[in-house]
A protein has these predicted regions:
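Substrate-binding/active-site clefts of carbohydrate-active enzymes
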Residues: 3-13, 17-53, 60-172, 190-201
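Conserved small/polar residues in nucleotide/adenosyl-binding loops
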Residues: 207-214
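Residue-level recognition of beta-strand->loop/alpha-helix junctions
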Residues: 56-59, 180
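An alpha-helix initiation/capping motif
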Residues: 183-191
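Short catalytic-loop micro-motif centered on adjacent basic/acidic residues
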Residues: 101, 176-182
Length: 214
C-alpha cells in the first residue's frame, strides 16, 4: 500500500465549483476564451484567512456543459480561461501555502469527445470503438445519462490515456485528484493507473467520495 503524503494529515480544503462560482454560462457559447479564473484567484487570501490549506476544485477541463462531460482532458475549459490562467492560479495558491486538488472525471466522457465521436463513426471494432463500452450495438452511457459515454476501462489504451492525463497536470503543479465515480471503475484499472502516477508524483493525493455521496 502506498504511503500517504504527510501534508494530507493536516489538510483543510475549501471546495469550489469553478464554472458556477465565476458565473460561466451553462454551455460554451463559442471556443473563445473567457478569462474568468481570476475571479476565483482573488478569493485565495480569504481561503487562507479561514484556516484552509487546500483549494479543492470541481471540474476545470473543457466540457460540453456542467464539467462532468469532458471534451478534452488536456485543456482548461475556455469558459474559465486558458492554460496560462490556470498556471497563474496554481502559482498564486502555492505562494499562499495552499495545495490544489482537481476533479478527475475518468469514468466517462462527453458524447462530443473525439473518442466517442470516432467510436460512433467507426464502430465497436475500431481503435476508438474499443475505448468505450457498448450496449445493444449502441454507445453505453453512464447511469442513463445520454451525453455521458462510458469508457472501457479494460482497454490498456484507456489506462494509458488516464495515466498520461494525471501525470500531465501533476507535472504542471496539481497536488492531488478527486476520482469522480471511482466506484464504477473496476479495481484492476486503478491498480494499474495509480501506482504509475505515484511513481512519478509520490506526494500526490488520490481520493474519492463514497459511492453514496456521488
Amino acid at each position: 500500500m502506498a504511503q500517504r503524503p504527510e501534508w494530507v494529515d493536516h489538510l483543510i480544503g475549501w471546495h469550489v465549483y469553478p464554472l458556477g462560482f465565476v458565473g460561466a454560462p451553462m454551455h460554451p457559447e463559442s471556443q473563445e476564451v473567457s478569462h474568468r479564473l481570476g475571479h476565483l484567484e482573488v478569493w485565495l487570501d480569504h481561503v487562507v484567512a479561514l484556516g484552509c490549506s487546500g483549494l479543492v476544485l470541481g471540474p476545470v477541463f473543457s466540457s460540453a456543459s456542467h464539467g462532468y462531460d469532458t471534451l478534452n482532458y488536456f485543456t482548461i475549459d475556455p469558459r474559465l480561461g486558458d492554460d496560462a490562467d490556470f498556471d497563474h492560479l496554481l502559482q498564486a495558491a502555492h505562494d499562499r501555502g495552499l495545495s490544489v486538488l482537481v476533479d478527475g472525471v475518468f469514468n466517462h466522457v462527453s458524447s462530443g469527445h473525439h473518442i466517442a465521436q470516432d467510436a460512433q463513426n467507426a464502430g465497436p471494432d475500431s481503435e476508438a470503438g474499443r475505448m468505450v463500452r457498448w450496449r445493444d450495438g449502441q454507445l453505453d452511457v453512464f447511469e442513463g445519462h445520454g451525453g455521458l459515454i462510458a469508457l472501457n476501462h479494460d482497454n490498456p489504451a484507456v489506462r494509458e490515456l488516464i495515466t498520461q492525463v494525471m501525470n500531465y497536470w501533476c507535472d504542471r503543479g496539481v497536488d492531488g485528484w478527486r476520482l469522480d465515480a471511482a466506484y464504477c471503475v473496476n479495481p484492476e484499472f486503478w491498480a494499474a493507473v495509480l501506482p504509475a502516477v505515484r511513481e512519478k508524483h509520490p506526494d500526490c493525493l488520490l481520493y474519492t467520495s463514497d459511492a453514496a455521496d456521488e
